[in-house]
Amino acid sequence: MLLRRHFWRYATFDEIAELYVSRMLRMAALYLVNTFVSIYLYQLGYSLTAIAFVWCGCYAFKVLAVLPLTRIIALIGPKHAILVSNLIYIPAMIMFANVNGTSLGLLIPALLLQALSVSMYSVAYSIDFSKVKSIHHAGKEIAYMNIFEKTTTGLSPVLGGFIAYAFGPHVVILFAAVLFAFAAMPLLRTGEPVRRHQHLVFRDFPWKLLLQHSAAQFSYGFDVFVSGTAWTLFVAVFIIGVTSNNSVYATTGMLVSVVFVVAIFASYTYGKIIDRNKGRELMRAATIMNALTHVVRPFIQTTIPVAGLNATNELATTGYALPYTRAVFDNADLSGVRVTYLGVIEVISNAGAACAAALLGFLLIFIEQKLAFQGFFFIGAAVSLLILTARFPLYKK
């Protein structure tokens, strides 16, 4: 029992390294593309309203797909699910690279495959890494994985931006497909670390435990869309300016990547704070700081403040995300139904992101475009404060 629960304590170096390598390659591929997808659609002729509703549909599809995908993960195991999710992303990228104009013929299947891949990976990775569970060092372990992730995601937008500037965004997308193929390879070396052929369990599901942070989980997903897709699109369209020479990709890539050093420093420091039983205080302070960054967004007009705000926001989001994730993993242990529990909270966070995208879409219909984004950021600030409503048993001890 102890061996199964604390897999990372007994795993060989090769088993741990393969997940790290696969994770880094996948995140590199993902951030090569994700930073620029909305900009690419805008260049192709999609309106800002259409882009918002495209993302709303994508997240809504994830809401419907997560639990069936979680069922598959329970059957085949998280490592095999990660492998499958990487392979699914390859045709999605190839289709997306061939999207032409505003035709939906390739865009819809590309986004649906992307949604399936991301949802399957997110749940499978959480199941695998949640088994880190260590009373004294879980914060540090989650922080180290965040450092690996931020190292990759910090450098990828710069690389992707300059490739897009030199050769066009479609080349970046195809390059990402190649990286997804390489990301699958390390997972072929060793077997599944957890028991396979499990089932989703809703009988005696700990709904009370879930409800204690369900509003915060919704807010978590909402905030991901505000800080990521919406902010990137706002900066590209209203601050940098989208032109036909693709320079927007290089500039956006550099602005996104300034968080690289900040994220590494913050992850290490925050991990130590969490392990000193100060996770709740860190989560509260960082949540308030994150809300304040959203309030400032509408007033940014040039690229240098964008870089500063991105760095500040990274401090805030890392500050609440690490202790929040630590507590969610603890809840997954307490629930007794780890796989089902993590699948359900993924549904809630995707619902939050879908509502955020839908709200932005409706604001863009009824209000002038720039004003709609500015109002959306103010609303995002208020919604992000719902993270303060989370009540975790871990932080009551």
Sequence positions of predicted segments:
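C-terminal transmembrane helical hairpin of 12-TM major facilitator-type secondary transporters
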Residues: E281-A321
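Substrate-agnostic recognition of the 12-TM MFS/MFS-like secondary transporter fold
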Residues: E18-T35, C58-T70, I88, A110-A164, ...
